[in-house]
Amino acid sequence: MGRTLLLLSRPGCGLCREMHTVVERLRGEFSLELVERSIADDPALLERYAHEIPVLLLGETELARHRVAESDLRARLRALGVSEV
């Protein structure tokens, strides 16, 4: 089992689908689990991130917001010492 990424999203969010796709591609390179959580289900998250999604977190560390290039996320994961497969 790898490190867990949390993707904050909401239904119908095109940018969220794009970020999910990028993360899924990188799961083949890194030891990662992905949990996706809709801000629509949590009033506190909705208030905090209403216009900021998608947001990708590793623990308390924000890895990306709105858009992320696969190469940039790969570099961030390596810099944070996430194990490669």
Residue ranges and their predicted role:
Residues 50-56:
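Structural micro-motif
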Residues 27-31:
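Short helix-capping segments at alpha-helix termini
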Residues 32-43:
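Thiol-based oxidoreductase modules, predominantly thioredoxin-like and allied folds used
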Residues 1-25:
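Local sequence-structure signature of Cys/Sec-based thiol-disulfide redox active-site neighborhoods
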